[in-house]
Regions:
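Charged docking surfaces used in two-component/phosphorelay signaling
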Residues: 15-23
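Conserved phosphotransfer cores of two-component systems
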Residues: 26, 42-46, 66-74, 85-94
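Active-site residues of response regulator receiver
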Residues: 52, 80
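Receiver (REC) domain active-site loop signature in two-component systems and cognate sites
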Residues: 55
Length: 125
């Protein structure tokens, strides 16, 4: 079980992702934008940040950069409909973020998260 923060501006996608990850046994919190996610990251530790690349205000890449300052152990996975275009020319991204392109199947999302996290313990435990 991992503690996951989902940052996604689309309400239905955010709910869909959170529900699937909870059914897979993870503890999930959600944020509607990058600024809300930063506030949540300041209050608690997470194992994984699952962020949409394109969000109003603060995009997922900037969110990941800021999150890495406070939680360097945080794993990052981006979800986007156009990963190659959205991430082109983005230098200074923390760690080795994974990218999952929309559309995707839930079993692929869960499998990639499980692979990314391995047997990591719950953050803050």
């Amino acid at each position: 079980m991992a503690r996951i923060l989902v940052a996604e501006d689309d309400d239905s996608m955010r709910s869909f992702l959170a529900g699937a990850l909870r059914r897979a046994g993870h503890l999930v919190e959600t944020a509607a934008d990058g600024f809300e996610a930063i506030t949540m990251l300041a209050r608690a530790e997470f194992d994984l940040l699952l962020a949409d690349v394109v969000m109003p205000g603060m995009d997922g890449v900037e969110l990941a950069r800021r999150a890495a300052r406070d939680q360097p152990q945080l794993k990052v996975m981006f979800i986007t409909g156009f990963a190659a275009v959205a991430l082109r020319g983005r230098s200074g991204m923390p760690g080795d973020p994974k990218i999952l392109s929309k559309p995707f199947h839930l079993k692929d999302l869960v499998a990639q998260i499980d692979q990314l996290l391995g047997a990591r313990p719950l953050a803050g435990a």
